[in-house]
Amino acid sequence: MNKAVSDLSSHTPMMQQYWRLKNQHPDQLMFYRMGDFYEIFYEDAKKAAKLLDITLTARGQSAGQAIPMCGIPYHAAEGYLAKLVKLGESVVICEQVGDPATSKGPVERQVVRIITPGTVSDEALLDERRDNLIAAVLGDERLFGLAVLDITSGNFTVLEIKGWENLLAELERVNPVELLIPDDWPKDLPAEKRRGVRRRAPWDFERDSALKSLCQQFSTQDLKGFGCETLTLAIGAAGCLLAYAKETQRTALPHLRSLRHERLDDTVVLDGASRRNLELDTNLAGGRDNTLQSVVDRCQTAMGSRLLTRWLNRPLRDLTVLLARQTSITCLLDRYRFENLQPQLKEIGDIERILARIGLRNARPRDLARLRDALGALPELQVAMTDLEAPHLQRLATTTSTYPELAALLEKAIIDNPPAVIRDGGVLKTGYDSELDELQSLSENAGQFLIDLEAREKARTGLANLKVGYNRIHGYFIELPSKQAESAPADYIRRQTLKGAERFITPELKEFEDKALSAKSRALAREKMLYEALLEDLISQLPPLQDTAGALAELDVLSNLAERALNLDLNCPTFVSEPCMRISQGRHPVVEQVLTTPFVANDLSLDDNTRMLVITGPNMGGKSTYMRQTALIVLLAHIGSFVPAASCELSLVDRIFTRIGSSDDLAGGRSTFMVEMSETANILHNATERSLVLMDEVGRGTSTFDGLSLAWAAAERLAQLRAYTLFATHYFELTVLPEAEPLVANVHLNATEHNERIVFLHHVLPGPASQSYGLAVAQLAGVPSEVIVRAREHLSRLEDTALPHEAPKPAAKGKPAAPQQSDMFASLPHPVLDELAKLDLDDVTPRRALEMLYALKNRI
């Protein structure tokens, strides 16, 4: 980025003005308005030209040096801004605020807005179905304060967290596009590995000033009403966020009305690895196809989709809330009531973000048109909601108000299909304001006046080729061919000479020009003033409007979950106080949708008698699917949704852990095995008897003995913790665990071979698997047949020559014992053993036997 320039004396007046503004924002790109373009200069220009793939050129000189520059048309800036924001850049918008006609020297310019990835609110720059969050964090390993703001909705939350692991897990859940941290934090902390990290001055996080600014924002004396007055660190982080939002928006933020105190104890905690492995809203490739959200989200509004995503990423342990949601879904399913609500909800649209843009005073005409349509649809929707007897739905209906006065105001003000922006006018209806109507009439009737004037002048002068016209540079004119110009009347005043023509003006035309041109500019100014006043009227009603938007978003989610329950054959889970997890005919909600054949449903039963299932079976047999479907069923239950199972009975869980699949962490310098062990360590340190743990192929990233030993010890530890555990493995030796751990049971995914090909049956059956079918899976994967044949030969030789052994028994506590290696990996017999096997001891003399013994000893 540009370095600050302190000596401005050698620069031109224009560049002096530029540097005075640029020096205040050295680390951000500056769009500097010059006429119809945003110009970008110096290092900003070099960077922007590369990022936007536009031409880098030069503009004159300043301080004796050519000025690198590039530019974009101001009316096309939105697309370029969107690209820069997606690349993580922040852009300072510097507009002309002075009048070029009256300015002496450079036109006055000001920074009117700073667009950053986390504070952008323009519809074109946002993903409509995902939250756009900015976060701030303060504190240290002992305790962190975290604040999260969605400026596009007004949602503002705070919480305090102990330890880096919990903080990083929460940041993974929130996934902010910008993260503000104190400038005095040490470098290379774990949080700095995230995208969009911005260091801010330590005083931005100061608790007392933060408390004061937050109370001013919410018009309260203190924060006791929000339940967060004791959260010193979180308040400091929230104050920094509020200051950053005001700095970037350069306006009041009336849509930020409250703080919500979140608590980890209220939620089912998922760490970052578990979120990725379960593919809640992003698949492992970074896309959105074949995720849980892609299956369960058929919301009618974008704000409903965003709320559902928040629910999926923050499952709850509050039984009161969960039961209220279940009852609501049951009510909406009764007589298919959701079918009547969903088309009406679609008419509401994304009023949550529209209201935020109104609060930021950058709402566009089409935003107001959509709000008008939404308010017009509210009365009918409210009537439909009165029939919903579930208590929670009744509360939502009470919160959903109608706004007949605002609806009438917008209906009177905004034309049916307004332009995208107010810049050129044409937004307000005729009849909304009499003064505006008069000015517009004068401007719009100019064409008829010119036609009439041309006809009169032709008749008066007898010059048939006379024309009356207008251009932006010279204004109105009367044009005559050069040959007829000498016949022009005396009151024709020469204005412009062209090749083959002369242009004139008359006192009458000049008088009309003054009125018409003045009327057009005054009409535009009047319309913009009326539009701003309309926004102020709407801002005064923001609190109830935002409450209505929140209620309708939740109604949309609940209606959506009712529709999904019907069409995906989901059933209501039952929460019980007895520790258990019993699922009958459970299905994987995502896999089921992509299969062309019927999904094989399976049961699961974990309780005080069985806390762990050791799952064996062939690759591709369905072990990972079975494990993941269990986690997704439990998660869906903890958002209040129905679940893909014939029945489900469970107690509340506190965490869901998954250790399924790994890859190298190249950026962090960690191997696949190191990633696997880090995830395993996290589980072993934090799992409780109320946690659900999925462990898939632990130990496969190292040698057989090491991997088996680690897997064995980890399984023992989880059994002792009494966590609900599904432990999938290819180490057949682990199937003896139930002999030492009474809470452990074996199950397997069955398969069979037919004509040397494997057939996966996908049924979960009691007991361990009989074999692994590895070669059959390799054949199915397309491994060349000659390789398969050779592998069978090796396998046969290994099985024939391996030393026989029994399945190992669990080591006694305190006595280290390496588990025996499985036959597949057994070492080849020593050649000495081959020699001994060939000996006919009955034909060997004692002397010959002694000689052979010495010879064999020398070969060992």
UniProtKB/Swiss-Prot annotation:
Keywords, ordered alphabetically: ATP-binding, DNA damage, DNA repair, DNA-binding, Nucleotide-binding
User: From what superkingdom does this record's organism come?
Assistant: Bacteria
Protein residues bound to ATP = G617, P618, N619, M620, G621, G622, K623, S624
Return the annotated region ranges for Disordered. 800-823
Q: Which InterPro entries match?
A: DNA_mismatch_repair_MutS, DNA_mismatch_repair_MutS-lik_N, DNA_mismatch_repair_MutS/MSH, DNA_mismatch_repair_MutS_C, DNA_mismatch_repair_MutS_clamp, DNA_mismatch_repair_MutS_core, DNA_mismatch_repair_MutS_N, DNA_mismatch_repair_MutS_sf
Which GO biological process entries does UniProt record here?
Answer: mismatch repair
Q: What SMART domains does UniProt report for this protein, alphabetically?
A: MUTSac, MUTSd
Instruction: Spell out the Pfam families in the cross-references.
Output: MutS_I, MutS_II, MutS_III, MutS_IV, MutS_V
User: What molecular function does GO assign, one term?
Assistant: damaged DNA binding
Q: Which CDD domains match?
A: ABC_MutS1 (cd03284)
* HAMAP family attached to this UniProt entry: MutS
* Family according to the record: Belongs to the DNA mismatch repair MutS family.
Tell me what this protein is called: DNA mismatch repair protein MutS
